[in-house]
Amino acid sequence: DVAIVDTSADGVTVETPPSLDPSRRSARITLDNAAVTVLAGGATALRDLNRVILSADAVGIAAECTESAAAYANEREQFGRPIAMFQAVKHHCANVAAATEKATCAVWDAARAASTGGDQLSYAAAVAATLAAPAADLCANLSTQVHGGIAITWEHDAHLYMRRSSVLLGHLDADAAARDLTDLVRRGVTREKAIELPPEAEAIRDEVRAFAERIK
């Protein structure tokens, strides 16, 4: 179940504790005989939607860190050439790009499933939550390494992304999401693999079908 509380009501105390992520508000709520509205059976839907929203936040961090790391690697020179030419830096940039793309695909699918609800949403949201926060954390950390010393200054934004990704790791709990996904699979739940495309895409589909027939 889900309990909805009016934070301005009697018996409700709201405190703002310090947070690792200063860019996002946090609160500690204390209830003392406060009135609540209970949404029976709403916990699963709330959990799933929370996973979709926070996973989208996480892939946004991953994408920004990936883009900024690649851009910096191409402009920063060391030993007379851009650091993007060094194998170790290339590997970092490739790893963050791969993690970002994989998590982004999962989050897009979870967002599509939000209108469906039920087990389809639970499945897609669990996949997104399993991938997104770890991807954000990886990208924030490797982006910091690519940027080098400038990234550990207060003036640079890298520490903000590291803070947000660290907090999201706790909020999303990828391990719990993976366990929920395993339970769904054991129950026989699978994700529908159809993708809705606009009408103008049908002509392209015909071309693809014809090409597939030719190369069989």
Regions found by a protein language model. Give the residues of each.
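Glycine-rich phosphate/cofactor-binding loops in nucleotide/flavin-utilizing enzymes
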Residues: 149-209
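Oxyanion-binding "anion nests"
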Residues: 55-84, 91-92, 96-100, 104
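C-terminal helix-coil-helix/basic helical segment that borders enzyme active sites and/or dimer interfaces
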Residues: 70, 78-81, 97-131, 145-147, ...
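FAD-binding core of flavoproteins
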Residues: 1-67, 71, 191-203
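DHp/HisKA dimerization-phosphoacceptor four-helix bundle of two-component histidine kinases
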Residues: 54-57, 88-91, 95-98, 127-134, ...
